[in-house]
């Protein structure tokens, strides 16, 4: 195993993924990283094309929320929902949607992205990686039909203002969740104070990203 592969595999273990699934997921993610590097300059997918930075700042950052999202998925299944519908809003290059879809093959993932060229990239990645549980929707978040999804994720997306929060709440089914990947707790509190009329309660889960131990990362979980 080379240093590049071990960086990813060690990180996946630390993020709590199922041991038996890690080799397959790691192989898919290495292929995905290669696709990002190949198309990044043309599609402006991420802020780096360096392999190790992509592993740490994007793939492992996405998987740092794995355990919490697995817990939320289990709680939704306990409500009797047979086929969970998740969405990644403003998916861009597919983060965290593609990594999460690879880890939860039993859950349907919709990657929502308004830019058509990025949608073409996402469709290509889903095909190459064999992610049969992924579909790509070329649409503005505001145009998603009401109560379409059980859980939505977003990362490096717009701030949670009044308009965006109403849009997100509208597309989630009753009892569903939206999960935001965010940075500093001070900024989160400021954002959430501006929408306290819409979100009465929320949970902040501190994320430990392997390789980014000195950077503050949090997951904000809101329930409808």
Predicted regions: what they are:
Residues 93-106:
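Conserved SAM-binding loop of SAM-dependent methyltransferases across substrates and taxa
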Residues 80-92:
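Conserved class I S-adenosyl-L-methionine
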Residues 33, 91-96, 139-141:
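Mobile beta-alpha loop/short-helix "lid" or hinge segments that flank ligand
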Residues 11, 26, 103, 194-198:
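Alpha-helical structural signal in soluble globular domains
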Residues 2-81, 117, 124-132:
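Class I SAM-dependent transferase core
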Residues 106-224:
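S-adenosylmethionine
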């Amino acid at each position: 195993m080379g240093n590049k592969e071990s960086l990813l595999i060690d990180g996946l273990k630390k993020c709590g993924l199922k041991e038996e699934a890690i080799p397959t997921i790691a192989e898919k993610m290495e292929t995905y990283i290669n696709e990002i590097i190949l198309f990044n300059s043309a599609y402006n997918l991420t802020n780096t094309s360096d392999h190790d930075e992509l592993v740490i700042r994007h793939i492992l950052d996405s998987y740092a929320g794995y355990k919490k999202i697995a817990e939320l998925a289990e709680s939704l299944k306990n409500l009797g929902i047979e086929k969970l519908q998740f969405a990644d809003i403003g998916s861009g290059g597919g983060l965290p949607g593609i990594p999460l879809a690879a880890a939860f093959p039993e859950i349907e993932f919709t990657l929502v992205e308004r830019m058509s060229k990025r949608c073409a990239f996402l469709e290509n990645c889903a095909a190459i990686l064999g992610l049969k549980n992924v579909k790509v929707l070329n649409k503005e978040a505001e145009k998603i039909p009401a109560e379409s999804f059980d859980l939505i994720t977003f990362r490096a997306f717009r701030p949670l203002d009044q308009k965006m929060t109403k849009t997100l709440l509208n597309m989630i089914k009753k009892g569903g969740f939206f999960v935001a990947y965010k940075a500093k707790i001070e900024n989160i509190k400021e954002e959430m104070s501006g929408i306290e009329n819409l979100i009465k309660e929320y949970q902040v889960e501190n994320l430990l990203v392997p390789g980014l131990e000195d950077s503050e990362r949090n997951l904000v979980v809101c329930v409808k």
